[in-house]
Design a protein with these regions (language model features):
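Hydrophobic beta-strand-centered segment that forms part of the acyl-chain substrate-binding groove
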Residues: 2, 8-17, 84-131
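N-terminal leader/capping segments at the start of a protein or of a new domain
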Residues: 1-41, 45-47
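HotDog/MaoC-like acyl-thioester-processing domains
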Residues: 2-16, 119-168
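Catalytic strand-loop segment that frames the active site of acyl-thioester-processing enzymes
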Residues: 28-70, 74-75
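Beta-strand-rich interaction surfaces with strong enrichment in secreted/lumenal proteins
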Residues: 24, 66-67, 117-120
């Protein structure tokens, strides 16, 4: 009977949660420097994810005492982790077809370049959403256009990011 089916369960949703959790498990960051809370969309060409900045994060103490603002390097790191690393891990785990891009224990992503423009401040406790669209993934190098939005859906930052997968 259709009325007895649990609203929160659907085989596709369970499958996607497993994929997202597998990718999150492969992120090479510990909790104090992991800036990915949730992946809401993922394909071979695009990723959408979010992060909520903790009010007591270590970088707020000295970044404008009394009037803390999220440093641009942290905004850039959030964009890179969601927009480049998550998408790169997904491409590798799902067979990118590129030689030399297998994901093992001694493999880690490196940001090789970023060109970011900032439009709005991000304050402690704010939630941000990152959307990344792939330009290409060749020979272990991923290049994407990455945008960050605040909870009001205002553009916070936008940039072009490139990164590679390196063997340790």
């Amino acid at each position: 009977m259709a009325g007895n089916i649990a609203v929160n369960y659907h085989p596709l949703i369970a499958y996607l949660k497993n994929i997202y959790n597998d990718i999150l498990d492969h992120l090479p960051y510990k909790s104090s420097f992991r800036f990915v809370d949730h992946i809401s969309f993922l394909s071979k060409d695009e990723v959408k994810g979010s992060y909520t900045l903790q009010k007591d994060a270590f970088f707020y103490e000295d970044h404008f005492p009394g009037n803390p603002v999220t440093p641009g390097v942290i905004i850039t790191e959030i964009m890179a982790q969601i927009g480049l690393v998550v998408l790169g891990i997904h491409l590798i785990l799902n067979g990118s077809g590129e030689p030399g891009t297998e994901f093992g224990k001694k493999v880690f992503p490196l940001l090789t370049s970023s060109d970011v423009s900032f439009y709005k401040m991000v304050l402690p406790g704010e939630s941000v959403t990152v959307i990344s669209k792939k330009h290409y993934f060749r020979f272990g190098k991923l290049k994407c256009t990455v945008q960050m939005y605040n909870a009001s859906e205002e553009l916070v930052a936008k940039g072009i990011f490139s990164g590679i997968i390196k063997q340790a």
